[in-house]
Amino acid sequence: MNIKQVDEIKITRYILKATFEDWMDFSVNDVVIVGAGPSGLAAAYYSAKAGLKTTVFERRLSFGGGIGGGAMLFHKIVIESPADEILREIGVKLQKFEEGVYVVDSSEFMAKLAAATIDAGAKIIHGVTVDDVIFRENPLRVTGVAVEWTATQMASLHVDPLFISAKAVVDATGHDAEVISVASRKIPELGIVIPGEKSAYSEIAEQLTVEQSGEVAPGLYAAGMAVTEIKAIPRMGPIFGAMLLSGKKVAEDIIKNLQANSATLKSVQKE
């Protein structure tokens, strides 16, 4: 077997060329999702599947969010109906424990969800932190995000970010609702109040989280555990049905809103 020889400078140039082509492309998006956990990946999967240009920024060098930790590091988590339909769609094996309740392998879950998201057309970028948003007035709207290398922030270096535009920004950062928290603090006219999440009550938390997922302010959406933080909903522990269904609902809301905005714009242009 003869292995193709590639020198170091070619390696560098090929990587830089492909990388900058990507960054030039996804500097403008339909949807930017912050956080590659279960809700973020689900939102990205369904957004990309619908043909929306979708980019996911994940501050870590991995994806899956809380999936990988399983339940207190045990490698299994619970999924309930109807979220099992999403896992069947992407080929995750389900172990049935009772009607509508299943246990899945955490590694398989996050690997297949990420692969399905990429195959649907979404771009996932690791090692990038979103630390602010872009906004516009008249009408007031969130129109993108400010991004920085996670390593730069960890090193406490004073470096300005770059900016990425999006018609919809999704906060899927988990319990801290980091993007919405920044927007709430720095753009008070958005009128966002963050009461904080409540202690565990899984029987009601799953339903409430899905129902309350969606647009928080024009152009800004909440998915997954970020919803519990901004809506004072209880936490639910290692049951992940709501995370998937929340991401799917947010994607559906974005698709509907962007279609409505597009129709309005076309109507105005005709007039």
Swiss-Prot record:
Annotated positions binding Fe cation: 160, 175
Residues that bind NAD(+): 39, 58-59, 66, 130, 158-160, 225
This protein's record includes keyword Transferase: yes
Positions bound to glycine: 235
Cofactor: Fe(2+)
UniProt keywords, alphabetically: Iron, Metal-binding, NAD, Thiamine biosynthesis, Transferase
The family this protein is said to belong to: Belongs to the THI4 family.
Protein name, as recorded: Thiamine thiazole synthase
Organism classification: Archaea, Thermoproteota, Thermoprotei, Sulfolobales, Sulfolobaceae
